[in-house]
UniProtKB/Swiss-Prot annotation:
PANTHER family: 3-OXOACYL-[ACYL-CARRIER-PROTEIN] SYNTHASE, BETA-KETOACYL-[ACYL-CARRIER-PROTEIN] SYNTHASE III, CHLOROPLASTIC
Organism for this UniProt entry: Porphyra umbilicalis (Purple laver)
Function summary: Catalyzes the condensation reaction of fatty acid synthesis by the addition to an acyl acceptor of two carbons from malonyl-ACP. Catalyzes the first condensation reaction which initiates fatty acid synthesis and may therefore play a role in governing the total rate of fatty acid production. Possesses both acetoacetyl-ACP synthase and acetyl transacylase activities. Its substrate specificity determines the biosynthesis of branched-chain and/or straight-chain of fatty acids.
Keywords: Acyltransferase, Chloroplast, Fatty acid biosynthesis, Fatty acid metabolism, Lipid biosynthesis, Lipid metabolism, Multifunctional enzyme, Plastid, Transferase
EC category name: transferase
Keyword Lipid metabolism: yes
Localization: Plastid, Chloroplast
Membrane-crossing residue ranges in chain numbering: none
ACP-binding: region residues: 253-257
Single annotated GO MF: beta-ketoacyl-acyl-carrier-protein synthase III activity
Protein name, UniProt field: Beta-ketoacyl-[acyl-carrier-protein] synthase III
HAMAP family: FabH (MF_01815)
Main localization of the protein described in the UniProt heading: plastid
Amino acid sequence: MGVHILSTGSSVPNFSVENQQFEDIIETSDHWISTRTGIKKSILPLLLPSLTKLAAEAANDALSKASINAEDIDLIILATSTPDDLFGSASQLQAEIGATSSTAFDITAACSGFIIALVTASQFIQAGSYNKVLVVGADTMSRWIDWSDRSSCILFGDGAGAVLIGESSINSILGFKLCTDGRLNSHLQLMNSPSDSQQFGLTTVPKGRYDSIRMNGKEVYKFAVFQVPIVIKNCLNDVNISIDEVDWFILHQANIRILEAIATRLSIPLSKMITNLENYGNTSAASIPLALDEAIKEKKIQPGQVVVLAGFGAGLTWGAIVLKWQ
């Protein structure tokens, strides 16, 4: 049994922050941000962001394009590291879109989350467990940023992307590879804050609060530039497809310098990489499905083309998927 991508969808907040606006908050400039990251503006909410509502808008967009009712979905997988509820927001998403017949759960793998979620969804379909699965990658990074840290606050934006997949006699997912190295976890993390505590009898119990994102940019850059080309090449080798036979590469939209370095290591022109980083910033788990949806809207991706998706991020985790677009 194969897996077919039925439709895609996306959603972003309706407020953008231009690079120049950061100059009033921190010591930086539009030139510094754009040359080092490729970002020209980020998308942030005017009010308190709702992960669930962003995810629901992307999900409904995908459902509408496929002319499928939410009640017909068997499973929802929400890839996010910033849920509205610490226990997970997939159930809230299920309720929001009215997918009352579906099972729903979250996957937390930061910027690799969508890749892992899509692979997980495909396994359920290939096993014959479910017929239609909705995969959503969504993050509201704005609420976990230290806005005084210029190394990280300029990078992130909020957004959501969705992919609806179903069973088919033809398999659109040709192969995949997933990787993790927990020894590198400290390079990118959002940890529990030990500063708050409460007294319980003779015991002091920490309160459940978290710090802001902390990132070692140099180490993350080295990790991504080294590991991502390897996992892409290995994945392509497994399905007997050469780099030259790939029509498009859609990578996690982290930083333009990372994407340029990966393109160089793969010996491919940057024009083969679909990017939207300059308009949204790093939207974490949303970045790949958001870029995929835009590429389809713009008719860049055509039937029969080979597309490589690759994510990398906190964990540290990374992975790749090879698609044959149908």
